């Protein structure tokens, strides 16, 4: 058995070299690489701007480990997220499908899952690449952020849990980091809820005082019962406004190992070492492969949890410190691959779920990312800054080092790419929007298979791009854009995030047209007077939109009001509710 095991390891170590020889001998080498079953390591940052990384043009942020991946592999410069916010983008990444197909969108403004104790989530009838790879014999793990739902009918059914979507192992947050986890002034939920509760308290207190005065002066013929009830309700609301912050911290900011809560609420100073320890443990346990590991970083989402030895070290404040710490984490993971002899047999992919947030700002201090030359940011369905993200692939000896590809690609492309590498079949019973990237990465194809890409904001189509290959032109058409606040600011600074519909968006007739191949910053609007083929482009894009919309089927919207309200009976709790507190694992080594 020892001899056979050693032979297996030797074969896996020679695999990349053998594949490289095949690539040099035959133009159809990509078909030889299919089903080669490498280990697959997927790294996804949270809220990272494409301009935050050295290899994408930042010369003041230190990201040597991510830059090394690009130097040793293939860098995609037109890599597009299917959505500009966390939940829908991650759903599209895992399924290879626009989030509107799975219902991971909203029509009322709830654009991501709002609570761990909500019933919405990635539907069980969706097929993730993890599910297919597990069926093909891969060990599958997810470490870090999930944010695709947890429970449906009870606090323990875990119907949306990663382990029900193809992952053998899960360690991390079933929800997402938020400013509220650290009771930051930059608040996603707490401040808004406190304001509403305080308003209701004032109303009920006024009612109670009015009834008391009317009762004592005999002007209002009322019994004492409604007076007492209104007064008690006012006191309860006042108490709730004080405790809502603690409720959010305990309800959403916790860690799980598989189906068990290990830390509620999270101890931030332990989080990064625990994540790294878990990654190293998974790699060591499964080094005889094959494995799929999805490391979904909590970085660089607010509240920007950063260890003390990285604080104050960057040139860009706390946000820069957090980016540089994440890069250090990438380096530690790469070191583990080297130590375990896995580097040459592992395909690595690095990306972000969407663009950096421009509205994360307190005074003159920016707590969000930089999107480089691209307009807009997180939450903006059509502008490039919200959806153009890093895309780096490394597979030593197989993928050419230092290659740069400017063709349009999508996060959804990872689905068919890894399924093909694992020897699996892409589902034929549903529309898969992603395209296999292997021919493009290997250089056996010069053009992306994406002629069109659609850009949604919630369930509303805001923009579309057309790659007109015969002209070498990348057209971008905007049907709807948000109204920036203040005007011309490039972001919605009066809000947490730009809206998708309503009075604060503009519906363009005719739509806005840009040529991204000459104007990637989307600064020069083309008109019939300035662009001779204006109407032909509009007609072709509109036809593509109609063809795309004909492939859509009605599905329940997981992020609408019913699926996105907090339900106490769905709330995970490792102690007597609402005193949810536990610490079940030792400090990291």
Swiss-Prot record:
It comes from Homo sapiens (Human). Belongs to the sulfatase family. It catalyses: an aryl sulfate + H2O = a phenol + sulfate + H(+). Expressed in the pancreas, liver and kidney. Almost completely inactivated after 10 minutes at 50 degrees Celsius. This is Arylsulfatase L. Keywords: Calcium, Disease variant, Glycoprotein, Golgi apparatus, Hydrolase, Metal-binding, Signal. The modification 3-oxoalanine (Cys) is found at residue 86. It is linked to Chondrodysplasia punctata 1, X-linked recessive: A clinically and genetically heterogeneous disorder characterized by punctiform calcification of the bones. CDPX1 is a congenital defect of bone and cartilage development characterized by aberrant bone mineralization, severe underdevelopment of nasal cartilage, and distal phalangeal hypoplasia. This disease can also be induced by inhibition with the drug warfarin. Glycans are attached at residues 58, 125, 258, 344. Its EC number is 3.1.6.1.
């Amino acid at each position: 058995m020892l001899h056979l095991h050693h032979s297996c390891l030797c074969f896996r170590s020679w695999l990349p070299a053998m594949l490289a020889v095949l690539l040099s001998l035959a133009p159809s080498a990509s078909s030889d690489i299919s089903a080669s079953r490498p280990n697959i390591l997927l790294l996804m940052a949270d809220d990272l701007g494409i301009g935050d990384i050295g290899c994408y043009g930042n010369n003041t942020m230190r990201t040597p480990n991510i830059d090394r991946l690009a130097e040793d592999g293939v860098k995609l410069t037109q890599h597009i997220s299917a959505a500009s916010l966390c939940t829908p983008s991650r759903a599209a990444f895992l399924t290879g499908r626009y989030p509107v197909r799975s219902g991971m969108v909203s029509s009322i403004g709830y654009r991501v899952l709002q609570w761990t104790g909500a019933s919405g989530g990635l539907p069980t009838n969706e097929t993730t690449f993890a599910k297919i790879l597990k069926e093909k014999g891969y060990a599958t793990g997810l470490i870090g952020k999930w944010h695709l739902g947890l429970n449906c009918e009870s606090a323990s059914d875990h119907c949306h849990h990663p382990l029900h979507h193809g992952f053998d192992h899960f360690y991390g947050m079933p929800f997402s980091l938020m400013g509220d986890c650290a009771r930051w002034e930059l608040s996603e939920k707490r401040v808004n809820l406190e304001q509403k509760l305080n308003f209701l308290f004032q109303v009920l207190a006024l009612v109670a005082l009015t009834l008391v005065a009317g009762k004592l002066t005999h002007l209002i013929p009322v019994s004492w019962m409604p007076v007492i009830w209104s007064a008690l309700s006012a006191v309860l609301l006042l108490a709730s406004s004080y405790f809502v912050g603690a409720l959010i911290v305990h309800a959403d900011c916790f860690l799980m190992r598989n189906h068990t809560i290990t830390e509620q609420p999270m101890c931030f100073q332990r989080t990064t070492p625990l994540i790294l320890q878990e990654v190293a443990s998974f790699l060591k346990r499964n080094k005889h492969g094959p494995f799929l590991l999805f490391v979904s970083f909590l970085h660089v989402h607010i509240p920007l949890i950063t260890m003390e030895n990285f604080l104050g070290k960057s040139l860009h404040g706390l946000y820069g410190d957090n980016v540089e710490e994440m890069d250090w984490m990438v380096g530690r993971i790469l070191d583990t691959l080297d130590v375990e002899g896995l580097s040459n047999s592992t395909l690595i992919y690095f990306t972000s779920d969407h663009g950096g947030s421009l509205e994360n700002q307190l005074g003159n201090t920016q707590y969000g990312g930089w999107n480089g030359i691209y307009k807009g940011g997180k939450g903006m369905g059509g502008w490039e800054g919200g959806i153009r993200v890093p895309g780096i692939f490394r597979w030593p000896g197989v993928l050419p080092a230092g290659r740069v590809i400017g063709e349009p690609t999508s996060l959804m492309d990872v689905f068919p790419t890894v399924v093909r590498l694992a020897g699996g079949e892409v589902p034929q019973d549903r529309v898969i929007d992603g395209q296999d990237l292997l021919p493009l990465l290997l250089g056996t194809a010069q053009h992306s298979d994406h002629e069109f890409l659609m850009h949604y904001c919630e369930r509303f189509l805001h923009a579309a791009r057309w790659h007109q290959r015969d002209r070498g032109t990348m057209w971008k058409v905007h049907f709807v854009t948000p109204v920036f606040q203040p005007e011309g600011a490039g972001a919605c600074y009066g809000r947490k995030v730009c809206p998708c519909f309503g009075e604060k968006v503009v519906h363009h007739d005719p739509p806005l047209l840009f040529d991204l191949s000459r104007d990637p910053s989307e600064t020069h609007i083309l008109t019939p007077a300035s662009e001779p083929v204006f109407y032909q482009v509009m007609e072709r894009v509109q036809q593509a939109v109609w063809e795309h919309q004909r492939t859509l089927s009605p599905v329940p919207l997981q992020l609408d009001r019913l699926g996105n309200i907090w339900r106490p009976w769905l709330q995970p709790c490792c102690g007597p509710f609402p005193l949810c507190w536990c610490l079940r694992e030792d400090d990291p080594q």
